[in-house]
């Protein structure tokens, strides 16, 4: 379908495709995607629009973008969806949090696992409503049947991790994001469970 859209655009006087992408993902994906696309379709302009998950869905439904690249766990009616990858969700705790004593290793996985039951009534620092990670966090809370004692909402992952780093609460992150966050030396990461993807 993608190649078909591009082929149709090639016959126009100013061929272009419009791609919506999550703000956080744009940092790592746009340069690589654009380079490959320009090699294959040098005459087609790519117009990127960024936003959070809710904004991207609105753009797509209104027809202001042709494609979206995002973390999307729910089905969208009448939409062709291609899964590019699955990405693990990580729990982020301050390095001296007492729940770390309950962490356990599973096989050769790069991070230990931690049961969320040990974090009931804790302070969680989470993304804003409309962000894909917020949707994931809400699902994780529901599945684990825990209730945060306090929620602090922040729209930027770097700010969330900086708050976890100084012990203000617990956060969540994606495996693909943490390679840019090595500066947070006092954050310890844990897998939540085997099904905590997207």
Model-derived features: positions:
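N-terminal winged-helix
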Residues: 4, 8-41, 45-58, 73
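Short, well-ordered beta-strand segments
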Residues: 16-20, 68, 125, 171
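Short beta-strand-centered segments that line the small-molecule binding cleft or hinge
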Residues: 32-36, 53-96, 100-104, 160, ...
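Secondary-structure junction motif
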Residues: 101, 107-144
